[in-house]
């Protein structure tokens, strides 16, 4: 080893020892005839002092981020010179030897200052030398180990599934890889290990997991990555409660890495209740504002805006004092979310109602409104009216925005809930309008995915009454973030074919794209279920950072570009020719002889 000790490990008990440290020059300070540097490695920082002779002369050429090795004697700092901000703040190393292991060019940004994201990603290897980004990756490693430990205790088998597979409709666009040996044909990078993990259950593995890389060619969305990581799990001979129970053990171990004792079991809420109370299927439960149903209250109204299939409200405490410009800003807030506006009523300190909506209400509607929605003098009541799904979503977004503006969210709180009893299907046009990909050509598409089993009560009726069919699905939500989702899977060929047909995937297409799965279901497939955790999002929450880019070693920018390597990049004409991108696929693709040697 080029060093005897880690820089962050030295303490007063080490005084008198001769040590060799290796790391980077974080700071250099000239104090008269003495030079101090902060020497940083992965463990922390130690102060090194160069006082005399050749070692002092050599230290004059040191600059920020030079990589060095220093030998010296550990000394207790003089009284009054201690630094209580760092663990090594009571000692320093009196240098006797200095070796420059690698010089540094002038830095594109100072590591102790905040740099722009583009520069940070382009020089990510420098960015990761900083304490915050570097520790985020170290935390991620601990999180991986914690999850693996729990799953090993419960007899899970870690299995790697293919990253070169065939393109199947799973809810997003595939990244395609040309198959050079079969010109005109393409592999697809997996959007998830979903189909392979189900095949592993058919294979009798019973308990599977992997920390899986997944790929989705999606349109730009804030804080999304084209390649991301899941903790993927699947179990045979289980019901939803069994998957939830083991998932909670994983979450408890993972949150213990930051010293938080997660109380179990976690609460559960139905999808219908989550939408009704919070306007979201991933409700943030760290604060108490809830939506109020007003449809029945306004059933006889003459106000045309409220003559709608759904009318709801959310109360902003103290919101009546907002200036007109701020209230106008709420209208823009609604328009950005695809709505015409956000109606409001202001409750005066004397209880009188103001604002443009109040004058359109009847005396009876005005008299009982404050009590109905639970408002107080000085509050603002926001309304949304229209189809229930869209209006509730607007009120749910308004609820979150109110909490942010009023500072109602405790940043140190953890609020978990399972959301259960999801609809099995959603209207395809609604899915498309929300920016999702509607799989199949039917009027209905799967809300989770096509392999989610219906609840027992919906098995016989989901194709005749799709709007009321419930799936045996469950999502886990933390602080308003969906951090995992799973379900009991379909394990019967006949039910899977009915689901495909419901989604507009006909028999021939189903056989072409999913025949391998359907065939497997013909050989004694066990009941099974599982879950996939968004590992990047979970790690970001644990690290206390806003973006998943902070917990990925070499992330892409928001547009899917890697500033470090300048990927994606054009290929050469020769590469294009060799890959067979433009070739017409042969209809009689060669098949591997099952008897041939591997």
UniProtKB/Swiss-Prot annotation:
Keyword Aminoacyl-tRNA synthetase on entry: yes
GO molecular function: aspartate-tRNA ligase activity; aspartate-tRNA(Asn) ligase activity; ATP binding; nucleic acid binding
Catalytic activity: tRNA(Asx) + L-aspartate + ATP = L-aspartyl-tRNA(Asx) + AMP + diphosphate
Keywords: Aminoacyl-tRNA synthetase, ATP-binding, Cytoplasm, Ligase, Nucleotide-binding, Protein biosynthesis
InterPro entries per UniProt: Aa-tRNA-synt_II, aa-tRNA-synth_II, aa-tRNA-synth_II/BPL/LPL, Asp-tRNA-ligase_1, Asp-tRNA-ligase_1_N, Asp/Asn-tRNA-synth_IIb, AspRS_core, GAD-like_sf
Chain positions recorded as ATP binding sites: 216-218, 225, 482, 534-537
Biological processes per GO annotation: aspartyl-tRNA aminoacylation
Top-level EC class as recorded in UniProt: ligase
Region (Disordered): 558-598
EC number of this enzyme: 6.1.1.23
Region feature (Aspartate): 194-197
Entry's family note: Belongs to the class-II aminoacyl-tRNA synthetase family. Type 1 subfamily.
HAMAP family reported in the protein's UniProt record: Asp_tRNA_synth_type1 (MF_00044)
PANTHER family found in the cross-reference section: ASPARTATE--TRNA LIGASE, MITOCHONDRIAL (PTHR22594:SF5), ASPARTYL/LYSYL-TRNA SYNTHETASE (PTHR22594)
Protein name from the UniProt record: Aspartate--tRNA(Asp/Asn) ligase
Organism: Mycolicibacterium smegmatis (strain ATCC 700084 / mc(2)155)
